[in-house]
Amino acid sequence: MTRDIVITEVALRDGSHAINHQFTVEQVVEVASALDEANVPYIEVSHGDGLAGSSLQYGLSRTPELELIEAAVSVCKQAKVGVLLLPGIGTIKDLKTAAALGVGMARIATHATEADVSAQHIYQAKELGLTTAGFLMMAHMAAPEKLAEQARLMQSYGADVVYIVDSAGALLPDQAGERVRALKQCLHVPVGFHAHNNLSLAMANTLVAIQEGATWIDGSVRCLGAGAGNTQTEVLLAVLDRMGIQTGVDLYKMMDLAEDIVSPILQVPQEITRDALVLGYAGVYSSFRLHAERAARKFGIDSRDILIELGRRKVVGGQEDMIVDVAAEIAQRYSSTKIR
């Protein structure tokens, strides 16, 4: 089968953020089965923050992720199940455990300027026989030249593909294009792109990335992902078909999956709320939204103020504990102002 673009469906990983990591085995089986039947080549399954992400810091999973991964693997006849691993959260032991369950892909994620911490994890994933991707998160925080330098490191460690990851949904189309061009000029492995829709630019950025040569593309069915979600897979498939770009994925089956199976899972409609918009505007990690909203309720303040301050401080993924600290500081300032 010819695929001009390789689609990885991320709803069962990135979408975990949107539902507070409450996926059940039954939901994963139903979604993964439908994705496999639609001929999606890669399906990512894990806690939203990757292997071993279930914690007070990032959010506790309702169901142990290994059970979810095993369930997905058991129903996939052609698709490879993938996992995300952030060094420092997940370990090589976690990677080996996932591989033993039958996963076929590992994506090793670091901050955009910290590719060096991925070396042993990429090497181990390759040793385990997994399709291995480097995942450069918060890509808006690194200039194209810096991002290219980091991508070359991941390639040198053995990555089969390197992704530009717009974790905050902050990139504008020209910025997305610049970054893809920079990687295409210096890599011999394929370039991937992962978008978030916080500024309503996920589709535009993804199409620009494809036009600049990215061939591994992430989508999330029904837009189920952190913040305002990702590039909506079924919509992307329709657009690419109109453009004459082959994905090998069945559009009608993906539409049915979105409408009949994934839509009922959503706790609220996936839309660009004011907080999701501020994520993209301020350049804040998309999974911070629900954490900031909880902190705002606790301290009686505006969640947008928290997110704007986090953006000003350039807080990155893994610093979720800063959200409560910032909220407390803002609440103290509010209180001091009222006293005066």
UniProtKB/Swiss-Prot annotation:
Residues reported in the UniProt entry to bind Mn(2+): D14, H194, H196
Transition state stabilizer (site feature) positions: R13
The protein's Enzyme Commission number: 4.1.3.39
All copies of domain Pyruvate carboxyltransferase, residue ranges: 5-255
Binding positions (substrate): R13, D14, S167, H194, Y285
Pfam families cross-referenced by the UniProt entry: DmpG_comm (PF07836), HMGL-like (PF00682)
Catalysed reaction, written as an equation: (S)-4-hydroxy-2-oxopentanoate = acetaldehyde + pyruvate
Positions of the catalytic residues: H17 (proton acceptor)
InterPro entries: 2-IPM_HCS-like, 4OH_2_O-val_aldolase, Aldolase_TIM, DmpG_comm, DRE_TIM_HOA, PYR_CT
This protein's UniProt keywords: Aromatic hydrocarbons catabolism, Lyase, Manganese, Metal-binding
EC class of the enzyme, as a word: lyase
GO biological process: catabolic process; L-leucine biosynthetic process
NCBIfam families per the UniProt record, alphabetical: 4OH_2_O_val_ald (TIGR03217), PRK08195.1 (NF006049)
Database matches in HAMAP family: HOA (MF_01656)
Entry's family note: Belongs to the 4-hydroxy-2-oxovalerate aldolase family.
Name recorded for this polypeptide: 4-hydroxy-2-oxovalerate aldolase
